[in-house]
Amino acid sequence: MTLSTSISTFAQIQDSESIRPIRDSIGFCWNAEEMNYFMKFLSTNNPDVKPIPQKLVAAISVHDDYLYAGNVYYPLYQNIKTKEVVIFGVTHGSVRKELGPQSNVLILDDYTKWQGPYGEVEISPLREFIKSKLPKDNFIVSNKAHSIEHSIEALIPFLQYYNRDIKITPIMVTQMPMEKMEDLSNRLSDIINEYAKSKNLKLGEDIFFLISNDANHYGEDFSNSPYGMDANAHKLATENDVRIINQDLVNKISNEKIYQTAKDILPDSSNKFTPLWCGRYPIVFGLMTISKVVKVTDDNVLFGKLFKYSDTFTEKVLPVKNTSMGLTAVFSYKHWCGWFTEGFFLNKNN
């Protein structure tokens, strides 16, 4: 091997390592033609879904398999029309198993680009701005963590379908107590506001916030079956999900509502039943951060609108054939997952 060949090979290896690899090649769609076909199916399957009149500034998205949750993803993404998106993702057990317990920090990555079905996805300059401004004990940088985690990549094909030039700031949120979330969200919102002001970015037009979350993971595989494992248990558990959403996350989003959300979905030392939402920390931390960004940049307040709630047992498998998409888990009364999509917009503070 010549020196020039060796240098070229090394450069190719470095370049490939700087692009985040796809974690889930089964549950999500990474082929442009297949994504186009899937979106056409969803459009036909959801003829009454139209863009909403309000300009969204933030949202909560499902991150489960597309063949299960496609109808729940679909109503949201046509309403996201910004240049860049901050994505608050989960730190799943698979990450903690590999890296050990992670808490009280945000996890950022160091990749130059992420993969998408329509080409590589650029990283927003905001990520490096956050690294330069946030105290070092508030975050870690781990490509390994981001390469294992699937909750952020799940959103990229839908984002990229509507905007081929989308830029992202991927942020994994770890477990942390409320006082830590308050402190860290104060710091992060100040940094985001400084960045947005320096770039003259407007909420909902130039920059957007997306929270990745799946609702209750129910059944014996999750050690989570307080109502039993039959049709009535499924009814009670899904009704509880919807109750929490309508009570805590719809209409005006106040600080009191964010704290009530935390009481309803975060585990504590008591023996009360807490539904197993895997995006519980991203939801609470994300809403804290977003509400503080809104408070500084606008006289309006945040309002939430539910697009759709469903679950694997209700939706079952979408009849989309001849694609590379598949399922990463089975469903039954002993194993199902709830999900929802919701948008947040600004409204007058009356």
Task: Label each region the model flagged.
Residues M1-S6:
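Bacterial N-terminal signal peptides
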Residues I7-A11:
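Sec/Tat signal peptide C-region and signal peptidase I cleavage site
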Residues Q12-V284, M288, K292, T297, ...:
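Active-site histidine-anchored catalytic micro-motif
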Residues V293-N349:
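Long, Lys/Arg- and hydrophobic-enriched amphipathic alpha-helices
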